[in-house]
């Protein structure tokens, strides 16, 4: 009588099946059409996945699967790529999702604008102290980029609402940070 060995498959095959089984972003719960696979806070691209030829049986895959998460492209960029620390982008995004009735597309527009502005202000070595003074769109007006100034002002006013909401309804420290170690 022979003992049957458990069936082993390459990790890349398990990941392909995993990728196709995911329907919603693990972070914002948006229905997925394009997917970003993340392992321990780092994006793993399709070329790297295709090279994962380690053989696993089903039990090993069950353990390994806990290390992987499927995100929409937007959340993948926000949570896994370096961000400027000028604004609390992750907290702002959560606020827009949880406290407003905005569509995912509108949230994305506000977040992208604020992220670009934060990167721009950091590159210009603008002091973070300006965030403490009154209305953000007025405080930062002299340093706003010349293109799309109104769009940046609108995003700053929405961010001001987020900051006011934080002061009115103080919550425990948010588990969402601007780094990639959220997993």
From Swiss-Prot:
One of its GO terms (molecular function) is DNA binding. GO terms for biological process: DNA integration. It comes from the Bacteria. It holds the Pfam family Phage_int_SAM_1. InterPro entries: Flagellar_regulator_FliZ, Integrase_SAM-like_N. May regulate sigma factor activity. This is Protein FliZ. It comes from Salmonella typhimurium (strain LT2 / SGSC1412 / ATCC 700720). The lineage of its organism: Bacteria, Pseudomonadati, Pseudomonadota, Gammaproteobacteria, Enterobacterales. The gene is fliZ.
């Amino acid at each position: 009588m022979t003992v049957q060995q458990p069936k082993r498959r390459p990790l890349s095959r398990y990941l392909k099946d995993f990728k196709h089984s995911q329907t919603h972003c693990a972070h914002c719960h948006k229905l997925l059409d394009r997917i970003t696979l993340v392992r321990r806070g780092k994006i793993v691209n399709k070329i790297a996945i295709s090279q994962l030829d380690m053989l696993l049986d089903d039990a090993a895959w069950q353990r390994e699967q806990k290390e992987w998460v499927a995100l929409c492209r937007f959340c993948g960029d926000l949570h896994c790529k370096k961000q400027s620390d000028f604004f609390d982008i992750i907290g702002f995004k959560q606020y827009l999702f949880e406290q407003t009735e905005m569509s995912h597309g509108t949230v994305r527009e506000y977040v992208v604008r604020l992220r670009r502005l934060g990167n721009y202000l950091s590159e210009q070595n603008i002091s973070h102290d300006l965030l403490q003074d009154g209305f953000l769109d007025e405080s930062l007006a002299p340093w706003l980029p010349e293109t799309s100034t109104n769009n940046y002002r609108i995003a700053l006013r929405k961010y001001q609402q987020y900051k006011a909401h934080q002061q009115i309804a103080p919550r425990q420290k948010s588990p969402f940070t601007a780094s990639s170690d959220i997993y």
